[in-house]
Amino acid sequence: MSTFYQKPFLKLLDFTASELTALLQLAAKLKADKKNGKEEQKLVGKNIALIFEKDSTRTRCSFEVAAYDQGARVTYLGSSGSQIGHKESIKDTARVLGRMFDGIQYRGYGQEIVETLAEYSGVPVWNGLTDEYHPTQLLADLLTMQEHLPGKAFNEMTLVYAGDARNNMGNSMLEAAALTGLDLRLVAPKACWPQAALVAECSAMAKKNGGAITLTEDIASGVKGADFIYTDVWVSMGEPKEKWAERIALLRDYQVNSQMMALTGNPQVKFLHCLPAFHDDETTLGKKMAEEYGLHGGMEVTDEVFESAASIAFDEAENRMHTIKAVMVATLSK
């Protein structure tokens, strides 16, 4: 795929709608080939660095398994296993790693870090997550949506994101809607809306591609007719405890539960989540939330919805690997 060869993958708006379509088609092919035992290795002899300043289960496993499937070797650099940004600048780290590796994945903090890595390394750099964007997650989401509504184009689908829409997921969803023409509805309190400039830019692009972007606080009108309802965690262990009560009070009404699913009026509506999800009391944080804030049976999503037939979160999680593989194959093989 010469269009992508040696290019970085930093955010979705760096690509055109047709390029995004090509990546999704490649991911679907690679997935089918793996399932059928017909996968052709395109990355034999390639060395890949995986920089993780923030831990992850799905992102790390997806990159590692995808690389191994394709014949590449990986080196994991965790937050305590490198000098990046501490004893060595991002620019210097990029220039060192670029001499040793064929590609670099970065998962961590500011978008400027992954952009600096891409600028100075001289090799493809892939954004596994930054504070601002999560593009590989959206590739998996879009592939999953295609699989569950195979007869529909993206500009015939309605995707609702309920909860805190001002984060990297909200930003990347806006970019995805801009390119695909999705009917995207961000159903959230105004305090949790994304930056107006990005909303305006993406809304104009979405309209040209047959879609629309809506921001609303009204749950009933926001979810009506939805094909998919998506949410993400409200708090994480890395955030100060004083933020928890404030965030929960702000978002409690936007929990994805059976009532919200019913308000869509669509008995076939599906539930999406980028994971991990606090849908029960079986994790340390889930237990703490239940005890301190009365959130038994789920925080951002109820256990009832998460464990229902409507939930396709694990299809989505699997597709992280197939879509990440597509990104690596597209950018590292001619």
UniProtKB/Swiss-Prot annotation:
Enzyme Commission number(s) from the entry: 2.1.3.3
**Classification via InterPro entries:** Asp/Orn_carbamoyltranf_P-bd (IPR006132), Asp/Orn_carbamoylTrfase (IPR006130), Asp/Orn_carbamoylTrfase_sf (IPR036901), Asp_carbamoyltransf_Asp/Orn-bd (IPR006131), Orn/put_carbamltrans (IPR002292), OTCase_ArgI (IPR024904)
Q: Which residues bind L-ornithine?
A: N168, D232, S236, M237
Q: Which GO terms describe its biological process?
A: arginine biosynthetic process via ornithine; citrulline biosynthetic process; L-arginine biosynthetic process
**Its pathway?**
Amino-acid biosynthesis; L-arginine biosynthesis; L-arginine from L-ornithine and carbamoyl phosphate: step 1/3
Q: Which reaction does it catalyse?
A: carbamoyl phosphate + L-ornithine = L-citrulline + phosphate + H(+)
UniProt-annotated binding residues for carbamoyl phosphate: S56, T57, R58, T59, Q83, R107, H134, P135, T136, Q137, C274, L275, R320
Q: Which GO molecular function terms does the record list?
A: amino acid binding; ornithine carbamoyltransferase activity
PROSITE patterns reported for this sequence = CARBAMOYLTRANSFERASE
Q: What is this protein called?
A: Ornithine carbamoyltransferase
Q: Which cysteines are joined by disulfide bonds?
A: none
Principal location class = cytoplasm
**Function per UniProt:** Reversibly catalyzes the transfer of the carbamoyl group from carbamoyl phosphate (CP) to the N(epsilon) atom of ornithine (ORN) to produce L-citrulline.
Q: Which family is it part of?
A: Belongs to the aspartate/ornithine carbamoyltransferase superfamily. OTCase family.
Origin species, per record, is: Salmonella typhi
The secretion signal range is none
User: What is one term from the GO cellular component aspect held by the record?
Assistant: cytoplasm
The answer to keyword Cell membrane applying to this record is no
Q: Where in the cell is it found?
A: Cytoplasm
- Enzyme class per UniProt: transferase
- UniProtKB keywords: Amino-acid biosynthesis, Arginine biosynthesis, Cytoplasm, Transferase
Has keyword Methyltransferase? no
